[in-house]
Amino acid sequence: MTKSTKLRHCKQKKKKPEKTPKGNPPILITEKSIEDAATTTSTTDALLGSPEGSRSKSRKLKLCCCTAQAATLSPLDPTSYGGIASTSAHNGMVGGLSRDSRAASRTSKRGSSKSLNRPQIDADEPSTSGTNPDRRPSTHFVLDLPVVSTRLRKLSEAFFNAQHGDKIDLMNDWEIGGTQNKWVCPSDRHLHLRAQLKSGWSVRTATARSPTNSKAQTGSITAAEQEHIQKVLAKAEESKSKEQQRIGKMVDRLEKMRRRATGNGVTHCLLCHTEFGLLASKSYAAMCVDCRKYVCQRNCGVETTDVNQTTGKVETVFLCKICSEAREVLWKKSGAWFYKEMPEFQRPDDRLPYYVPVTTNGTLPNASSAATPLSGTPGGAGPQPMTMPSTSSCQMTTPKWASPGVCNSPGLQMNGGPTSPLPNGTRRNTGHGGIEFPSSSRPSICSVLQAIEPLDRSKSPRPRIQPRWVNEKVMSSMSVDDEEKAASSSDGESFVQSGVPRRALNNKTPVGSTSATTSPAPPPTSTTPTSRREANMERFSRHTHAHANRLYSTDDDDDSSPESRPSTRSTSPRHSLATPSSYAHDTCHDTSLPDADTRSIDSGVVQSDHSNPQQSGLTCSSSSLTPLQQQASHDHHSGGGTPRRISNPDRTTSRVAQSASGTSLVTPPPPISSRTSPDNCNSSPLNVMEHKSSSASTASSGGNRRVGSAEPVLNNHHAMHNNQNHNDINKKLISQTSRAESPLAASSSFLSSPDDDTKQKNRRRDGVGRVNSLQLRTSLDDVAPPVAPISKMNGHIVSSEPTSSTTSNQNHTSVPIPTVPVVPEEEEEKAITASTESASEPGSLGSITLTLTYHSADKKLKMHLIRAKNLKAMDSNGFSDPYVKFHLLPGNTKATKLTSKTIEKTLNPEWNEEMSYYGITEDDKEKKILRVTVLDRDRIGSDFLGETRIALKKLNDNEMKKFNLYLESALPVPQQTKEEENEDRGKINVGLQYNIQQGSLFININRCVELVGMDSTGFSDPYCKVSLTPITSKAHRAKTSTKKRTLNPEWNEQLQFVVPFKDLPKKTLQIGVYDHDLGKHDDYIGGILLSTSAKDERGRQWIKCIENPGTLVEAWHRLELDS
C-alpha cells in the first residue's frame, strides 16, 4: 500500500466533528424573544395574506398571554407547546429577530454542546438568590425551522378560516396538541383569561346574556326547530304505542293459556285435564310452587331456578307452564323488573280492559269517551292503551268471584291479609297508571294474575272444587246481610289463595231432592231487628229442608252443579287426613275433635280437598249431627271464632221419635229464638246423652230415611220446660256422666293407648246404665210431662216440645204431644257404644310405639322409636313413606327438632332407632311435653299422618317406660312470646378441673343446646369465647372453633389457663356464646359467669372445682343475655 493510500485511510478513520448546516441554523427562543415576537403579530398576519391585514387587540393579547404562560410554566416540555413556540419563533423570524435572540443564538453556536434538543439556562443571568429574586432564569428552546414553519402555517390558516365560518374554540387546546373533544371543560388558566376578557365560559356561550352582549339576544325557536321537535315527539309516541301493543299481545296470550286450562289441579292436571289415577306413577304429578296446583310433570311444567328469600340460595323449583309464562311476561319481558310496576299495555281485541275507570255515579264511561284518541298520538288513530290507573282517579274492576266485603278496596283480599294485589300489602299511587311492585323482592305471580283479572272469568270451564269446611257456619247466628257477606268472602278466599277464580254460585235445586222446591227468599224491606229475625227464620227453614234432602248427595251447600261434584273417588297424589273430604258420599266426620291444621306441617303445602278412599267405609256417626257441650262452651269462653255447623233440631227430634216408637213421627222445626245472654250457652250432659242415644239408635237400625223434607211444617214456638225434678236430675248427672260422655273422654286422649280400650268401654257401659235408669224413672214415675230432647244451637237452648202457656197464647188449642216409649237398655247401650267409637275413631290414624328414659344425673332424655301400625296411605300407590319428628313444647321448635329415618312404601314401619335430648333439667321435666309427629315424606313437602303428645312429668328418674299411643289429628302449637325468647337463650354444658401438678385450670366446653337462631335462616354459627378475669396474661383468653348452621353445637374442646391455685377464689370465669358473621360484628347469643359470688348452680360448680382439685366437675347452665 502506498503512502498516499495510507494517508487517505487515516483521514477517513478520523472522526469529523458534526457541524450545523448553514442553510437552517437553529433558533433559540427565550422569554425576551417571545415578548418581542408579540409586537410583530400584525406583520406576520400581513405577510401570510390576512384578508383584514391585522388582528384585533383582544386576540393579540389572548395569543400573547397564552404563549407566554405556556413557555413560562412548562419549559421542560417543548413538544406540548410546540405550536405556541413555533408561532413566536415564526413571528420573530419574519419581522426580524430581536437583538437578544440573535445574541443568544450566537452564544449557543459558539460553545454550548448541550443546547441541542434541550432547554438551556443562560449563564449570564444572575441567580435567583441575588438582588432580584422574582426574576427567573432565561430558558432557551432549540427548534428546527421546517417544523416551526409547518406548524405556523397550519395555525395561521385556522385563524384565517375562523373569519368565514365555524369559530374555533381556542380554550380547548386541540390545535396545540390537546384533546379534540370540544366538550372538555377548559382549565383554570383559560377561565381566568376569559374572565379578564369578559368572553364567557366558551365560544358557544357568546350568544348568552352577559355584561358585554346583553343587547345581542337571539329570537325564539324557529319553525324548522319546532317541526323537528314535533317529529321527535311523534316518533317517541309511536315507539311507546308499539311497546304497549307488544306487552298487550303477551298478556292476551297468557290469558288465553289460562282459559284453556280445564283441569282442577287436584285430581286432574290443570292444563291437559289428565286424571291422576291409581295406575299412574306418583312422579307424573308435580305441584307448581306459584299456583299450588298439580300438573303433569313431563309435558305441562318446567323446572327452573329461583332464589330463596330466606336463605338467599338458588334452588330448583317446579312451575306449570302458565306460571312460567307469567313470570316471563309479567316480570321480565314487560319490563316490570326495571320499573318496579306493570307498564301500560293495549289489548289486541275489542274487549273491555282489565281496569276500567268508573265515573262519579258508578257507571262505566260511554263509547265516545272511551274512543277518544290519546293526546300526543299522530292523528289520534290506533286502539286506546288500557292503562291501570291509580286509585285516586279510577277504581279497579274486581272479578265476579271476589267477595263483596272487599270489592270496595283497591286491591283484592288475599288470605285474610291486606287488601292489595301485591304480596306485601298496600297499593301505592305511582303516578304512572300502573301497579307498583315492592322494590325489595319480586311479587308473586298469582297476585299479579289476580290484579289483572278480566271481567268474563265466569265463562271459564274450570270447575270449582270447594272443601266442606269453608261453609261450616251456624246459619242461625247470622243476619241476612252478614251471612251473604260471610259466605261469599269464605268462598272467594279459598280460591284467591290458590290463584284460581271461582265460578258464580249456582243456586239450583239439588239432584237428590224429591220434596217440594223452595222459593227464593224475599229481600228484607227494612233493617229492624224484627224484620231481620223474620227473614232469618224463613231462610233457615228453607235451608234445613234443603240440607236434609241432600244430606247424602253432596257436602257443598252453595253449588250442586255436576261439574263441581267429582264422579269418581279421589286419586290425588296428596290425600289429606286433616282436611274434610269433598267426595259426594263421604260426609261422616267427627266434629267433636278440635280444629286441626288442614295444611302440611313441614312445607306449607296446601293439601288437597279429597280424603283417602279408605274413609269411605266408615259409618256415619251421630256426632256429626249432634252439637257437643264442650265445643260450644269452648266457643263461648274463647269469645270468638266461627262455630262448626250443627244439625237441625227438627231432624234430630224426628230421629228420636223414629228410634223410640218405630213409627214416622213428624215434629215441627223450631224457629230461631231471640239472642240470649251468654249464660244460656251451657246445657247439661243429659241433653247430650239424649241426642247421642237417639241419633245413634237411628243409625244402628239403618234408618236412612229423610224426615221432615216433604211433610207440612207447623209454625209453633217451642220453649224449654223448666221443672225442678229435671233440674235435680241434671245436677246429679253432671257428676256421674260428664267424664264418661265428654268428647275428650270418648275420643283418644293424648296419653291413651290401644291397651286402654277395654277400660273405656267398661266406663261407657257403666255410664249408660246409670243414665238409662234415671231416664226410665223420669219418664214413668214423675208427674210432670216428659222432657223433650233439647237442642243447642249457637248458644240457644231450643226445646222441641212447646209448653201449655205458649201453645194457648198462639193457637188457643192444645196440640197433642206424642209419648215416646223408653228404649231398652241393651239396645241403647249398643247404640251409644257404636256412636262413641265411630265418633272418636281411636284407631283411624294408626298407633305408634316408643320408649322413654330420663337420666337425671346426665340431664338426658333417651328415646327409642320402635314402630308404627295402621298408618294412612297418602300416596297414589296405596302406601306411605313415613318418618317421625320429635319436638319439645313449649320452646324453640327448630332447636328441639329431631328427625328419624324414612321407611319407604309401608303402612307399618319398623324404625328401632334411638335419639336423645340433652340438657333436660328437672324444671324442664315438669313443664315440657314431647310432641311426636308422623309425616309422609314426598318429593315436595310432607303430608301429615298423625301426632301424639307425652308429658315428661309422667316419667320416673332412670326408669324406662313404654308407650303405645293412638295418633290424633293436628293440635295447635303454642307460640313463644318475645319475653320468653329473650329469657330462653339456650343452655351450655361446662366441665371444670384444676390440676395442681401443672398449676393450670382446664375448662371443657362440651356442648350447647336450644340456642337462639340469629341468622335469617333461623340457624346460627356458634362459637365460645372464654376469659379468666381479672386478666393478668394474654393467655387467659381463648375461644373454640365455629360450628356451622346449627342450634345444638357439640365442641368437646378443652382450654387450659395457667393460674395459681390460691388466686382461683378471686377469679371469675366468663363464657360467652357468639354467632359468627361475615362482614359485620358477631352477634351475642348469651353467656354465663362462674365465680364464688355467683348464684345457684354456677357458684356451686366453681366452689366444687376449688374444693376438689383434680376432679372434673360438669354442670348445665342456662345462658343469659345480660351476663
Curated annotation (Swiss-Prot):
Zn(2+) 2 binds at residues 288, 291, 320, 323. Residues 1-17 have a biased composition (Basic residues). Ca(2+) 4 binds at residues 1015, 1075, 1077, 1083. It comes from the Eukaryota. Pfam families: C2, FYVE_2. Residues 1-56, 88-140, 365-710, 737-779, 796-818 are annotated as: Disordered. Rab-3 effector. This is Rabphilin-1. It comes from Caenorhabditis elegans. The gene is rbf-1.
